[in-house]
UniProtKB/Swiss-Prot annotation:
GO MF annotations in UniProt: 4-hydroxy-tetrahydrodipicolinate reductase; glyceraldehyde-3-phosphate dehydrogenase (NAD+) (phosphorylating) activity; glyceraldehyde-3-phosphate dehydrogenase (NADP+) (phosphorylating) activity; NAD binding; NADP binding
HAMAP family attached to this UniProt entry: G3P_dehdrog_arch
Protein name in the entry: Glyceraldehyde-3-phosphate dehydrogenase
Organism of derivation: Methanothermus fervidus
Subcellular location: Cytoplasm
Alphabetized InterPro entries for the sequence: DapB_N, GlycerAld/Erythrose_P_DH, GlycerAld_3-P_DH_AS, GlycerAld_3-P_DH_cat, GlycerAld_3-P_DH_NAD(P)-bd, Glyceraldehyde-3-P_DH_2_arc, NAD(P)-bd_dom_sf
Originating gene: gap
């Protein structure tokens, strides 16, 4: 049973902590917070040992009546590995601390690939992180792209990908972000960061462009893929049906928007209404000459969570076969495929 520390108990960290706790070969030995807020209290209610990320703030937690087990430094002493779920840019700064402590670490997609040196996606390049000291789980959008592009590449050979990414403006709890009434090219030039990020884990030719829109629910992707071997629509459906963490949805079933997909996620009865899988609209799958078209959605708060679990097994050399790790994680988390 491997001991996992979660540095940063926010949108991603709290989900990763719960996913780790569901596994039978690893456990959460502690989570960290910078502020004594409601999430800190909820962590304690869930039975997680709570550590203070900024030592100078220990007294703030004590004043708030929140019991802490120590500082992040203390937490790392108890762990085999740390999953850094801190805000963008903080993880790279924490890397020095992890190196000094001699502890292996997993970072999130907000960090730059160049700063960490290695990126991770369960299906695309699990083996590259096996036994390594540090890796970075690619971003939510990149994870979503890799989930569907990797099996297409394996099955038909990708010549080129062009993807238009419609990004949510903020997560539901981010009251300080927007836009409220605008569509923002992000950036107003090619490429968006998503294409280069895909290339850190999957060796394909890809260009991406993105816009930010005033919604908080999900991202949405419009993907065009030129392939070496032209498939039929049924061939593509078969590939997606056989791909872990990808599900086919249908507008005929009432799933015509990201809002309805999130309603579907609620009906699954999961904590926080998470959708770990990448839903692909069945009706959108089209083949014209040697080009595949399809539309998919990404629940930005949760799709990267199972990848973090697999990354633990890869780095700590707990499982060499990526499919065995994926299946083990999926079963523990009740992932649909």
């Amino acid at each position: 049973m491997k001991a996992v520390a979660i540095n940063g108990y926010g949108t991603v960290g709290k989900r990763v902590a719960d996913a780790i706790a569901q596994q039978d070969d690893m456990k959460v030995i502690g989570v960290s917070k910078t502020r004594p807020d409601f999430e800190a209290r909820m962590a304690l209610k869930k039975g997680y040992d709570l550590y203070v990320a900024i030592p100078e703030r220990v007294k703030l937690f004590e004043k708030a009546g929140i019991e802490v087990a120590g500082t992040v430094d203390d937490m790392l002493d108890e762990a085999d590995i740390v999953i850094d779920c801190t805000p963008e840019g903080i993880g790279a700064k924490n890397l020095k601390m992890y190196k000094e402590k001699g502890i292996k670490a997993i970072f999130q997609g907000g960090e730059k690939h160049e700063d960490i040196g290695l990126s991770f996606n369960s299906l695309s390049n699990y083996e590259e992180s096996y036994g390594k000291d540090y890796t970075r789980v690619v971003s939510c959008n990149t994870t979503g792209l890799c989930r569907t592009l990797k099996p297409l590449h394996d099955s038909f050979g990708i010549k080129k990908v062009r993807a238009v990414i419609v990004r949510r403006g903020a997560d539901p709890a981010q009251v300080s972000k927007g836009p409220i009434n605008a569509i923002i090219p992000n950036p107003p030039k090619l490429p968006s960061h998503h294409g280069p990020d895909v290339k850190t884990v999957l060796d394909i030719n890809i260009d991406t462009m993105a816009v930010i829109v005033p919604t908080t629910l999900m991202h949405q992707h419009n993907v065009m893929v030129e392939v070496e071997e032209t498939p039929t629509v049924d061939d593509i459906i078969d590939v997606f049906e056989d791909t872990p963490r990808v599900i086919l949805i249908s507008a005929e079933d009432g799933l015509t928007s990201t809002a309805e997909i999130m309603e579907y996620a609620k009906e699954l009865g999961r904590s926080r209404n998470d959708l770990f899988e990448i839903p692909v609209w069945r009706e959108s799958i089209t083949v014209v000459d040697n080009e595949i078209y399809y539309m998919q959605a990404v629940h930005q708060e949760s799709d990267i969570v199972p990848e973090n679990v697999d990354a633990v097994r890869a780095i700590l050399e707990m499982e060499e076969d990526k499919y065995k790790s994926i299946n083990k994680t999926n079963k523990a988390m009740n992932i649909l495929q």
